[in-house]
Amino acid sequence: IVGLKPFGDESDNDMYMSSDDYAFFLTKGFNIYYNDYLRGDFVSVRTFDNYISLANGNNAEQCGMNGFCSNQFVVEGDGSVYPCDFYCTDEWYLDNINTLSFSEMYRSPKCVEFIKSSFKLNEKCKDCKYFYLCRGGGCKRNRESSDYCDAYKQFFLQSEDKLKQLKK
């Protein structure tokens, strides 16, 4: 199954989608979603639901699509706590729930840095007409991985008006 590159993977491998392939996937998938919606046969697709919300001036409900992180504490079986399920790594280990409260971890320098680091924005995003939809690649883990910027631009170019037409 062809998929998107995992974050941090810079390899050139045929098992990962190219930017053009990903643009095709997004556009084709959204057109199916859109046509089903118009026929009254709506099935929620979280990514598209969130793009509709963003296109209509609202926030996304999925934390990663707002362009910055929020704390989504993950507690492992041994009590280890991390700020997000995508960052259960030694680097982002906050503490153990048996020794420190959530509010103490929330105010910890490491947790504050986790959130602060998510606001870093690529220079090319600052003047992009689709920033209000893309939010600089959304979740910071997506910004760390291979660049699908062109895919999103192609998708938004073809779908922006339809996204604005649908309201949740």
Short names for language-model regions:
Residues 1-68, 74-77, 86-97:
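Radical SAM enzyme [4Fe-4S]-AdoMet core and its adjacent flexible, acidic
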Residues 88-168:
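Flexible mid-to-C-terminal extensions adjoining Fe-S/redox cofactors in radical SAM and related proteins
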